């Protein structure tokens, strides 16, 4: 049997003699699966943490929420303070956030036998705002693209890709808002701003440990329950952890990390996954954090210092170090704001007018053009910025 001609894919080879068929070349040279190959939908990494606040009609596009600062908090700054002796003090929050024994004892609101006008405190509240923005895009197509394209389900496939694209845009908007809303920002090493980031600004076990202490002091809740061991595999017990999001560029840095005793700090997910639930994209744990790799994680290209030739083993752009975020999001730190939604997901509004009478007008008198549009509302409101933390680090190649 003659082999197919690689230079003429449309040529039909006669099995017996290997001569071209008198019918002529074939127009369809490949077997097309009826169901086209479609890229897997990108996972909603940040969306899994968000609730959606449903914005009612006729109340504008802005939502406001009041947040009351606790009495014993340094942020509770007011002019109502009177101490136990009746003297006016700077702030009406007693000892605020202090944990010094001497300070706390000296500012306790003691009372004498006759009482009196003493120990007056005050309270403060702040307004949190979220605003709705409308987004959308559209595509156009012709009647002939529906009639003659080799994919009989072209319209369905393209429509599905439009919806996936809108979902990915929403996820990107949410990621940007979270990065900009972090109330705790840390730089490893000596850097204090982006322009000072160099090869020494690499995240370490100590950096993560101290970040966790900051979040604990901010009363940030831990979003996962304690994982218990199983008898199936050699499982390590992971305490209640916080999700930490980073890009795949940081995997070499994380897996090379050592703890304070010189042992590997990274615990791979298979060591503990059988004992409980895991996050989408989770690859392991370090100290109190669950490491979640988001392939769509953004970063700041070339925002650091100029690359040192003696320390060039890190990602850079235009000969400047790139900065990669490690984002920690505690439970109930934020919400997204939706309009006409079910309270759980962003709702997309889709219009698809096929070519014909519905689209025929003076600009398209023959009705040969159709269109599909998609629009949605997106809004974001942070409840507790001090519960969102960000480490800015370089990443090893």
Swiss-Prot record:
Major location category of this protein: virion
Q: Which UniProt keywords apply?
A: Capsid protein, Virion
Pfam families tied to this protein: Phage_capsid_4
Q: Which GO terms describe its cellular component?
A: viral capsid
Keyword check for Transmembrane, yes or no: no
Q: Where in the cell is it found?
A: Virion
* Residue segments, region Disordered: 1-24
What is the recorded function of this protein according to its Swiss-Prot or TrEMBL entry? Assembles to form an icosahedral capsid.
- What is the protein name stated in its UniProt record? Major capsid protein
